[in-house]
């Protein structure tokens, strides 16, 4: 009974990237459960309980300090049950591409900056036993010659996740850092850019939202440092840990 009651209580969640396709779904789903949900993004999410607007800048320290200060002001001494970093994006290009530097810069900003800031926020504002999720990529478990910046950025996120699970990482006691490694998410933007693709191999956003819900409430939560591959085949999605 106690576990069932705990699973039903109102939670507090911070969604980093709360106006993206997956982030918006997370905000909607958790608000519908009467959870308190804060969105952190470059634009406001009006459906969230609170929104923090990230200022665009070419300085990582500037952006990190701004977000850290504003989240600190918003939360005060209150702790959150989960920080879901679902920010990210995609850009292609090999090492010879004219757009290599520009695309690498974009990937680092969208994936590494956001994941690093989320990790620091977790050390300050996550409850003991809380959850931090990071957005990795299955493709980055191997070389990604056609998308150099993307692969580097996601590879760094995987490494960060494993570091956070180690001793003296700064994470709260009992808290877990878990990276999800999808192949392709079924978003409106992806459908628009790849209209001929096999959508039955794309992961529905709802699947990840429900997975996050389970992990937040302690159901089937993998151990900290896990890199969880999210693979959809013919409309069926499975979660499989990546081992090295």
UniProtKB/Swiss-Prot annotation:
Keyword Acetylation: yes
Annotated catalytic residues: 150
CDD domains: DHPR_SDR_c_like
Subunit: Homodimer.
Name of the protein: Dihydropteridine reductase
Effect of residue 17 to R: In HPABH4C; severe
Residues recorded as bearing N6-succinyllysine in the entry: 73, 79, 96, 102
Gene: QDPR
Naturally occurring in which organism (per UniProt): Homo sapiens
PANTHER family named among the record's database cross-references: DIHYDROPTERIDINE REDUCTASE
GO terms under biological process: amino acid metabolic process; dihydrobiopterin metabolic process; L-phenylalanine catabolic process; tetrahydrobiopterin biosynthetic process
């Amino acid at each position: 009974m106690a576990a069932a009651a705990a699973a039903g209580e109102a939670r507090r969640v911070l969604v980093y990237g709360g106006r993206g396709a997956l982030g918006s779904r997370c905000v909607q789903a958790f608000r519908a459960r009467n959870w308190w949900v804060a969105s952190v993004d470059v634009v406001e999410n009006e459906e969230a309980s609170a929104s923090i607007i990230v200022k665009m800048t070419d300085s990582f320290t500037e952006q990190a300090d701004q977000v850290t200060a504003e989240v600190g002001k918003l939360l005060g001494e209150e702790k959150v049950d989960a920080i879901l970093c679902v920010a990210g994006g995609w850009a292609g290009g090999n090492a010879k591409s004219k757009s290599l530097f520009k695309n690498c810069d974009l990937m680092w900003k969208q994936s590494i900056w956001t994941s690093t800031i989320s990790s620091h926020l977790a050390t300050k504002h996550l409850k003991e036993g809380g959850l931090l999720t990071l957005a990795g990529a299955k493709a980055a478990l191997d070389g990604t010659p056609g998308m150099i910046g993307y692969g580097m950025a996601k590879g760094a996120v995987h490494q960060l996740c494993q570091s956070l699970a180690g001793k003296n990482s700064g994470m709260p006691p009992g808290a877990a850092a878990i990276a999800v490694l999808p192949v392709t998410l079924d978003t409106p933007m992806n459908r628009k850019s790849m209209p001929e693709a096999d959508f039955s191999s794309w992961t529905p956003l709802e699947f990840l939202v429900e997975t996050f819900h389970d992990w937040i409430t302690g159901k089937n939560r993998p151990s900290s440092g896990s890199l969880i591959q999210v693979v959809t085949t013919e409309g069926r999605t499975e979660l499989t840990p990546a081992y090295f």
